[in-house]
Design a protein with these regions (language model features):
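Radical SAM enzyme core and accessory elements
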Residues: 1-28, 39-41, 488-621
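N-terminal [4Fe-4S]-dependent radical SAM core
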Residues: 10-40, 47-48, 205, 211-262, ...
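Canonical Radical SAM [4Fe-4S] cluster-binding loop centered on the CxxxCxxC motif
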Residues: 53, 255-291, 602-620
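Short secondary-structure boundary/capping segments
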Residues: 56, 88, 124, 158-163, ...
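Glycine-rich beta-alpha loop elements in corrinoid/cobalamin-binding modules
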Residues: 77-222, 463-515, 522-537
Length: 621
């Protein structure tokens, strides 16, 4: 076992020291001297969250299958250790070798959520790597960003040497080959980055320059050199059944957010909800063969000792082989004490039958995500869920023994009116009425309905990327309308209402659609002590307000205005496969309250067919 980077004295004074010692079950062990490339894979949040992330496990497995690469892991130190490392000048280290990140060739950071941006700076700072890419030395690691937030990398572009746009299974081989060649030729860091910019899916921010108009919008976004492409096209794994997948995932030492075998059975979504970024950037839908999934289930349970299988997908019910897969898992593993988790199911007879087999009905809740209370607003957002379907599904569930329902909605959606807000409470009441229509002797106790509302944040590459947002007071006012409406309902005692923090929503909106001018404010927030901003107990909105003011940033510019259709967005240089023409058409259909059929019902010509596979080609021979 390697010598630990932290002394016993430190480990005994911090919370959950097992976060930092490595050596877990299935951890890959190599001699760093035997490889050409050392890659530190980072999730910029605490160990328990990072260890639950499937994407990290996939890349960790894929990289370590190579003889020339050693991939190790690193997560954000909790604030108690952060303070000690700063005081004692201890450099951040990888779990496997316990060696400093600054000695690696690459530091890859997956970026899943905008509120983790300050943790990216924490990782760089504790690693003793210059936070600004322009200030890095020749022997510093190449810092790579990836994940969904890289579809608008501009607010954090100054901190990264390059971004990988798309799914990680595709272009890393070419990047590693180039890196080894450049090292052999002893070319400069800048020359490596310039050559890397020509690799499909690789975006090198320093190779592009941005000009702005007097009104603050972007005038142009252009490459600095002729051999640097003007457009960066996302990379996508089309053959899901033969793609790399971790049969021996690392098992955390302490309880993580998800200690389960995760079976990813498809990527993408056919539904086309107009607010949903994942539904657009992961197009087209691609399925994994059920026989492959059966093999993974056996192997991963055997290799981990986990007692739960979780199915991973944006919309589980749309998987064409779902019934066969679920019945296989139930028949082969339920009697062995293995729980089966089925998220993202539509509530219909099949789903209720399945959930009745795998869940304790008396303890579990039924989850609906109508997103909007009224049918009008559900049409605006293209949520293919009618009130009739919701009430019928709830009725079948209640008759099957359920009595707990969770409802998820968004406030602040485009075209929303007060009637739409009140409709949230009215829908919850109708569900309660449906429960109490069941004879008393057949009910399972009292009905419990929980309403949760988040505030809508427009995201890049969605039809709502042109939409405006609102300020904190407006969001809280909308939540009050819903809260007051709940109190007016006949079954109000059966309804509980929760809502999201408005300050965080506004910040998410600034960061989600921001540009390079946001970076100085991020640095200021970190300098003021901002880390773990995704955690309520550490988030301090005043830091952000002060930082934006000190940097002269008008936050309303990023949140409070509807964008004209011809505005150049910071992310327009990325080709994610879905055309801007399609997004504009969907934005206009939303305003007309028109519903667009899902991909299996009718192709809408979004552009994803260019990838020549998946759902786009299901009916073509």
């Amino acid at each position: 076992m390697n010598t630990l980077a932290l002394s016993d004295e430190i480990l005994l004074t911090i919370d959950k020291p097992a976060r930092y010692i490595g050596n877990e079950l299935n951890m890959v062990k190599k001699n760093p001297k035997d490889v050409d490339i050392r890659f530190a894979m980072c999730f910029p949040d605490v160990y328990e969250i990072g260890m639950s992330h499937l994407g990290i496990q996939i890349l960790y497995d894929m990289f370590n299958k190579r003889d020339d690469v050693y991939c190790e892991r690193v997560y954000s130190p909790w604030p108690d250790l952060h303070k000690i490392m700063k005081e004692k000048n201890i450099p951040l280290f990888a779990l496997e070798s316990q060696e400093p990140i600054k000695d690696f060739d690459f530091l890859g950071i997956t970026i899943q959520y905008e509120m983790c941006y300050t943790n990216i700076l924490q990782i760089l700072d504790l690693s003793q790597i210059a936070m600004l890419s322009s200030e890095r030395k020749e022997d510093d690691p190449i810092v790579i960003g990836g994940g969904p937030c890289s579809y608008n990398p501009e607010p954090i572009a100054d901190f990264f040497d390059l971004f990988y746009i798309g799914e990680g299974e595709i272009s890393y081989t070419e990047l590693f080959t180039l890196y080894k060649q450049c090292r052999k030729e002893k070319v400069s860091r800048k020359e490596f980055l310039r050559r890397a910019a020509s690799i499909p899916g690789i975006y090198v921010p320093s190779m592009y320059e941005v000009a702005y108009k007097e009104d603050g919008t972007i005038a142009s976004f252009t490459p600095k050199y002729e051999d640097v492409p003007a457009t960066v096209k996302k990379q996508i794994q089309m053959d899901m059944s033969h793609s790399v997948y971790p049969e021996k995932p690392v098992v955390p030492f302490i309880k993580a957010i998800s200690c389960t075998v995760v079976l990813e059975f498809q990527r993408g979504c056919i539904r086309g909800c107009r607010f949903c970024q994942a539904g657009m950037i992961y197009r087209p839908v691609r399925e994994k063969d059920v026989e492959v999934l059966k093999h993974y289930a056996y192997e991963m349970l055997k290799n981990t000792g986990h007692e739960e299988i979780s199915l991973s997908s944006l919309s589980s019910s749309d998987y064409s082989q779902l019934e066969e897969l679920v019945n296989f898992l139930i028949d082969n593993f339920k009697d062995k004490g293995v729980n089966i988790s089925l998220p993202s199911l539509r509530i219909d007879a099949f789903s209720l039958d399945v959930m009745g087999k795998v869940q304790d009905i008396r303890k579990s809740s039924l989850t609906f995500a109508p997103e909007a209370g009224s049918q009008r607003l559900r049409n605006v957002i293209n949520k293919g869920l009618t009130e009739e379907v919701i009430l019928n599904g709830a009725g079948m569930a209640f008759e099957g023994g359920w009595n707990k329902v969770k409802l998820y909605f968004m406030l602040g959606l485009p075209t929303e009116t007060e009637d739409d807000m009140r409709a949230i409470a009215e829908l919850a009441n109708k569900i309660a009425v449906r429960y109490y229509e069941i004879p008393k002797e057949e009910r399972n106790g009292k009905c419990q309905i929980t309403i949760s509302t988040s505030f809508f944040v427009p995201k890049p590459f969605t039809p709502f990327q042109w939409a405006r947002m609102y300020d904190k007071d407006s969001y809280l006012g909308r939540a009050k309308v819903v809260n007051d409406a709940v109190k007016e309902q006949l079954n109000r005692k059966s309804i509980k209402y929760n809502w999201h923090e408005a300050d965080v929503t506004v910040l998410e909106g600034i960061l989600a659609r921001g540009d390079r001018r946001i970076a100085p404010a991020l640095l200021k927030v970190y300098e003021k002590g901002g880390i773990f901003d995704a955690w309520t107990e550490f988030f301090d909105n005043n830091r952000w307000v002060e930082a934006f003011a000190e940097c002269g940033i008008d936050t309303d510019f990023y949140t409070m205005r509807e964008r004209p259709l011809d505005e150049i967005f910071p992310w327009d240089f990325i080709d994610d496969g879905v055309s801007k023409k399609f997004l504009i058409r969907e934005w206009e259909r939303a305003r007309k309250e028109e519903v667009t059929p899902n991909c299996r019902m009718q192709c809408q010509g979004c552009g994803a067919a260019q990838f020549k596979g998946g759902v786009c080609f299901e009916n073509k021979n």
